[in-house]
Structures are given as C-alpha cells and as structure tokens.
Amino acid sequence: MSNRAVAVLRGDPGVTGTVWFSQDKESDPCVIKGEIKGLTPGLHGFHVHQYGDSTNGCTSAGPHFNPFNKTHGGPKDDVRHVGDLGNVEAGADGVAHFEIKDHLVKIHGEHTVVGRSLVVHAGTDDLGKGVGEKKEESLKTGNRGARVACGVIATAAPQ
C-alpha cells in the first residue's frame, strides 16, 4: 500500500498545480503539500470534493467530501467536512505554496480521499462563519466562489 497520493490540478486558463498527500498509517495526520500557479493574489478556498469525476469540468466533483454529515467549517474546527481544508494563499505572483497537516484527511481506510477530487476556488472560504444572508450557504460551502481548478486524487508511485 502506497503512503502517498497526488492530484494534478487544471482548470481556468493558466491555473495549474500539483498537490501531494502523504500518510504513513491511518492514525497519522495527513500532510498535504503543494503549489498552485495562475491564481489571483489572495486567499482561495481549498477542498476535497465527493467525486473523482471531471466529465463536466470541476462541476462534476460534487459537494465537499462529508462522510460524517457535518456542517462546513475550518480545518481546525471540531465540526467540519472531512474535505474542508480552509484556504491557500497566492502571493503577488499568483502562486500558492502550502503545507497542511490534517487529522481528518486519510489516504488509507474506509474514508480515504483517494479517488475523490481536490478543488481550488476563486474566492476566500469563510470557514462556516458567514452571517446574515450568507450564513446558510456558509454552513454548506463557505461561500468560496467558483471552482477555478481541480484534479482527481490518485495513488502515487512509491519514492
């Protein structure tokens, strides 16, 4: 069994990226490390979505991966979707470099993210903290905007 997975992201013109997942055993946190180019400067919602389906672009990826039927939240919240990874930040050059350690994301076991999609969004994820008119959507999606790139998370070759 491989302890690595990879997603190659494609989407809007010029938006590309590679994201690596590593996890030695199911009880360990998953390390998610990558680079995404071609983004507008600032924060971008970043999520694992339910389906590894790209037949209609990133729309086919479905909703956030949520096997425990929770509301949307931030990556450090107790109540959140498994797929809620928060935001990645692109610098003035449009490149986001990041490393995330997450205790809910798994590349082994019953609730693996392998075979699902990784999606980067146009806008900032509000981490389920939206108020007023935005509260209902905040608890589902984080009001993160359109999907600008996605890729299927696949088992990676051993190093």
UniProtKB/Swiss-Prot annotation:
EC number annotated for this UniProt entry: 1.15.1.1
Cofactor names: Cu cation; Zn(2+)
Superkingdom of origin: Eukaryota
Record function comment: Destroys radicals which are normally produced within the cells and which are toxic to biological systems.
Signal listed as a keyword: no
Top EC class of this enzyme: oxidoreductase
Cofactor note: Binds 1 copper ion per subunit.
Reaction it catalyzes: 2 superoxide + 2 H(+) = H2O2 + O2
Listed name of the protein: Superoxide dismutase [Cu-Zn]
Compartmental location: Cytoplasm
A Pfam family that the UniProt record links to this protein: Sod_Cu
InterPro entries: SOD-like_Cu/Zn_dom_sf (IPR036423), SOD_Cu/Zn_/chaperone (IPR024134), SOD_Cu/Zn_BS (IPR018152), SOD_Cu_Zn_dom (IPR001424)
GO cellular component terms, semicolon-separated: cytoplasm
Swiss-Prot/TrEMBL keywords: Antioxidant, Copper, Cytoplasm, Disulfide bond, Metal-binding, Oxidoreductase, Zinc
Family per record: Belongs to the Cu-Zn superoxide dismutase family.
UniProt-listed PANTHER family: SUPEROXIDE DISMUTASE CU-ZN -RELATED (PTHR10003)
Binding-site list for Cu cation: 47, 49, 64, 121
Disulfide-bond pairs as recorded: 58-150
Gene Ontology terms for molecular function: copper ion binding; superoxide dismutase activity
Residues given in the record as Zn(2+) binding sites: 64, 72, 81, 84
Gene: SOD
